[in-house]
């Protein structure tokens, strides 16, 4: 005589009501913020390096010149524009180097360390980019309008291509500044809420 024990299957298996997926962790929106952070960083890289490249290649020589005088406008004629090119290149370099930290924030959206590190450095480079963009904007304004009180004449009437390139570079740098502000606000909100 053999004894067998029949064990009935669980009611969940028979009826097909098992757990399909694990419940979502609260704060799953932080991963979305981290992905948006990465995308905005890519846009800021394009804006900052585009501004540096546009300003760095701004150069125009007037078609009329004499044996002794040649009229040329170039970014390296203005120390403010030199500062602009260097700082925008530094900002672009920082943004490239910050991409791995942004990826870590995507993989581990609840980690506070990478976000705090990015907020601190983003704030430092925001001030650098803002100072650079504002000083270049002041010089571009003088190039377009001049200053009657100091007898500075507007040069954009003669150097139109040069002024168009420098103006484009300044606009691009302010786009990078706005993206930095968005990055800082998004990271602060993601750190603040559970």
From Swiss-Prot:
- Top-level taxon in the UniProt lineage: Eukaryota
- Record-annotated membrane-spanning stretches: 33-53, 83-103, 116-136, 169-189
Q: What is its main location?
A: membrane
Q: Which residues lie on this side of the membrane: Extracellular?
A: 54-82, 137-168
- Where in the cell does this protein reside? Cell membrane
- GO cellular component terms attached to this protein's record: plasma membrane
Record has Cell inner membrane as a keyword: no
Q: Which UniProt keywords apply?
A: Cell membrane, Cell wall biogenesis/degradation, Membrane, Transmembrane, Transmembrane helix
Q: Which GO terms describe its biological process?
A: cell wall organization
Which InterPro entries does the UniProt entry name for this protein?
CASP/CASPL (IPR006459), CASP_dom (IPR006702), CASPL (IPR044173)
Name the membrane topology term: Multi-pass membrane protein
Q: Which residues lie on this side of the membrane: Cytoplasmic?
A: 1-32, 104-115, 190-194
- For whether the record's keyword set contains Transmembrane, the answer is yes
* Role noted for this protein: Regulates membrane-cell wall junctions and localized cell wall deposition. Required for establishment of the Casparian strip membrane domain (CSD) and the subsequent formation of Casparian strips, a cell wall modification of the root endodermis that determines an apoplastic barrier between the intraorganismal apoplasm and the extraorganismal apoplasm and prevents lateral diffusion.
- What do we know about how this protein assembles, alone or with others? Homodimer and heterodimers.
The entry assigns this protein to a family as follows: Belongs to the Casparian strip membrane proteins (CASP) family.
Q: What is this protein called?
A: Casparian strip membrane protein 2
């Amino acid at each position: 005589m053999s004894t067998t024990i029949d064990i009935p299957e669980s009611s969940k298996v028979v009826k097909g009501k098992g757990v399909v997926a694990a419940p979502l962790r609260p704060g799953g929106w932080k991963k979305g913020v981290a992905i948006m952070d990465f995308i905005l960083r890519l846009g800021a890289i394009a804006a900052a390096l585009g501004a540096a490249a546009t300003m760095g290649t701004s150069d125009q020589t007037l078609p009329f010149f004499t044996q002794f005088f040649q009229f040329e406008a170039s970014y390296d004629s203005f120390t403010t524009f030199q500062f602009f090119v260097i700082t925008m290149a530094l900002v672009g370099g920082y943004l490239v180097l910050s991409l791995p930290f942004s990826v870590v924030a995507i993989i581990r959206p609840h980690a506070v360390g990478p976000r705090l590190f990015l907020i601190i450095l983003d704030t430092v480079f925001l001030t650098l980019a803002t100072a650079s963009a504002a000083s270049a904007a002041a010089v571009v304004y003088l190039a377009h309008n001049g200053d009657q009180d100091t007898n500075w004449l507007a040069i954009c009437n003669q150097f139109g291509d040069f002024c168009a390139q420098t103006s484009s570079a300044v606009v691009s740098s302010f786009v990078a500044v706005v993206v930095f502000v968005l990055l800082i606000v998004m990271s602060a909100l993601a750190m603040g809420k559970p």
